[in-house]
Amino acid sequence: MSRIKILTDSSAQLTPEEIEKYDITVVPLSVTVGGNTYLDGIEISRQEFVKKMSESAELPKTSQPSIGRLVDTINDLTSDGSEVIGIFLAKVLSGTIDAARQAVKLTGKSDQVHIVDSELTDRAEGLQVLEAARDAEKGKSISEIMDHLEKIKKTQRLRLMIVNLENVIKGGRLGPISGKIANMLNIRIELQMPNGELKVAKKGRGKKFMMAFDQRVLDDIEANKEKIKEVGISYVSLDGVPQKLLDFAQKIKDINSKIDVLVRETSPIIATHAGMDAYAILYYTE
């Protein structure tokens, strides 16, 4: 029986240990910030990106991996007869999945390579990657793994709190006048990604709104505490891990000590969309 290998992109929130343990192949996105372009995770770290983003007058840009890199990666992974499941960030956020599909056509390996739109990014994408890798390790078939991924997608959650609207304004989602007023009013925005679409869920003012957001997430985790194995908490910060998020992680552990919680800096694509001090909670129910 042929081996099943897992392929993903650098926006997936995975630790170096996880990548090594499951032999996951990660293709880097490109990020342009401060007039220079870097390969995400290879030529620039997440912390370095956030620092450069904070110093840049222009909104950073992220670009999908090149078709050539994807073709080379697919040819390499399938050269021994292995099958590949490629799990990529939501199409609404990047053209990466379209590039991957095009690369599969160019290689003529559509019978060996199976492409999945995670419909999210960051740790939500990462959790799909990990479950696929674990399934492959257990000897499950391609169809079994693909079915499992579809089940995960139906219950996955991404709750994103935008604290600083500067990047939202730079990106044109708020006009300069509306943005200035929103900043003056201390407006915060909650984003979600139902069915792979980026949506504004709620808007509110100041710390009370953020506290209510946090409590809603904790209430949902409490209600599903026996169905959740892992929670990702991702953030954008110049000063390391915010204490608030470490406290939040502990509250999750207090709800159910068996839930694994990963607190980690987010990828450039989320940092670009969300801006400084943003944070996201990501998980799914079984």
Task: Show the residue positions of the predicted features.
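Short beta-strand segments
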Residues: 7-8, 88-90, 117
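N-terminal glycine-rich anion-binding loop in soluble enzyme alpha/beta folds
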Residues: 5-64
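Mixed-charge interfacial surface used for oligomerization/domain docking
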Residues: 3, 11-25, 30, 96, ...
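Glycine/charged-rich beta-loop-alpha catalytic/anionic-binding loops adjacent to active sites
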Residues: 52-55, 81-86, 106-117, 263
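Short glycine-aspartate micro-motif
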Residues: 5-7, 84-86, 266
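Glycine-rich phosphate- or other oxyanion-binding loops that anchor nucleotides, phosphorylated ligands
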Residues: 55-90, 98-99, 146
